[in-house]
Every structure is written in structure tokens, then in C-alpha cells.
């Protein structure tokens, strides 16, 4: 058996985000002792999943571990990536495939959130944290972001952690911001739970500037991005998918739900 890893990033229109994702994935390769490792993206960016998968096969891979670089569990992880794998893999029926989980709820990413807060240089004890996720109609997204918020509350001595979302589920972050316009004297950290920069981050920056006109005790952190703790969490996902010790990551050509995720 010849093992391969196929990393699957989301892809972006923004050049800086493209470069950050590609550099991050290239940097992961040195930490994984697998002979064949290829990078791909779901959309908006080359190489495609098809190109990456075929590159693995051409190098003799008989088992490909497909690992999505996604913070949250939603449609991309459950449907879009699996559907593309099914389409491409149908040409290579002898290749065994395992399929990994998104990062999800993980102490390592909670540490990344904490460090983004700490980087601001303002005392965080008894502060309020507003954690902004992308949002989705998929309930697992709300579950993931809420779970991360709860873990942060347990691990860091803050007053409260409020999970909210940019779109598609509630509470919407603008609703939370409107409640923060009245300065109650509590330091508030706004933490964008996003992997890369782009239109969503720009939108948050604009809204925080408006909020600060009413409440100067509001501080915006950097987006989570590819922090070393995010890297740790992702590498754990890569290793468990490649090992697939109990077959729990087997991909049988069905939907995401067909695997024991």
C-alpha cells in the first residue's frame, strides 16, 4: 500500500488569502511522514480536487486520505467535497479513500482564540468576548461555534463569551453589536473565527469602527487564521485520517453522513 494525503482548502478570490492557505498547507507537509502529499482547493483557486487526486494516483498512491482544511462542519465538508471526491474517484475504483473531519470543537483552536485576544495587549480578565463565526443553515455550525465559546469560557478567566454569526443563523453579530453600543465599562474583545482575510473580515472591521464610536472599550483581534495552534489541530486531523486505525474514516462513495463522523 502506498499512502497519500490530499489536502483540500476552501479557496478564495483574495490573493493574500490564497497565498496564506497554500503556504500553510505546504508547511504542514514536513510534519507528516507520508510519501505522497498534494494540495488542492474546492473552488476559486488551483489546483482543483481533481488535479490533486490525479497527482496522487500518478505517484502510485493506493490509499488517499482526503483532509479538508475547514474550521467548521457544514455543507462544504458534508456535501461539496464528498461529491467531488465521488466524481473523481469513480475513475479509480481500486484506490482506497479515507475522509477526514473539519477541525470543529478542539482545545487547540480555543488556544488560538486566546492568543489572538492576548496579542491585542489589553487585560482580558473579566472581559467580554464576542466570537464571530461565518454562519450557516446547518445546525452543526452553530454547535461548533457555541462549543468553542463554551470551552473558551472554561479555559480563560473572562466574564462571558457570546457566540454569534455573520449570516444564516442567529444571533447575528450586528444584533450583538447594537447591544454593545452602550458602554457598560466592560472590556469587549471581538474575535473573528475565520481562517483567512477577505470580504467578511473587511465587513467586520467596518462594523467594529462604527461600534467604537459609541463604545471605546471594544477591541478587534486578528482573524484566527493559520495560528500555530490551528496548525496543531489540523495536523491531528491529518494524522487520524491517514491512520484510520478502526476504519472510522473510510469513505464509501456516499455522503459525508455515511462515514462515522
UniProtKB/Swiss-Prot annotation:
Q: Which family does it belong to?
A: Belongs to the CbiX family. SirB subfamily.
UniProt-recorded name of the protein: Sirohydrochlorin ferrochelatase
What top-level class of enzyme does the UniProt entry assign? lyase
Annotated source species: Bacillus subtilis (strain 168)
Source superkingdom = Bacteria
A single GO BP: siroheme biosynthetic process
Q: Name one GO molecular function term.
A: metal ion binding
Residues bound to Fe cation = 10, 76
Q: What does this protein do?
A: Chelates iron to the siroheme precursor.
* Catalysed reactions, semicolon-separated: siroheme + 2 H(+) = sirohydrochlorin + Fe(2+)
Entry's induction text: Up-regulated by sulfur starvation and repressed by cysteine. Also induced by O-acetyl-L-serine (OAS), a direct precursor of cysteine, maybe via inactivation of a putative transcriptional repressor of the cysH operon whose activity is controlled by the intracellular levels of OAS.
What Enzyme Commission number(s) apply to this enzyme? 4.99.1.4
UniProt pathway annotation? Porphyrin-containing compound metabolism; siroheme biosynthesis; siroheme from sirohydrochlorin: step 1/1
Q: Which UniProt keywords apply?
A: Iron, Lyase, Metal-binding, Porphyrin biosynthesis
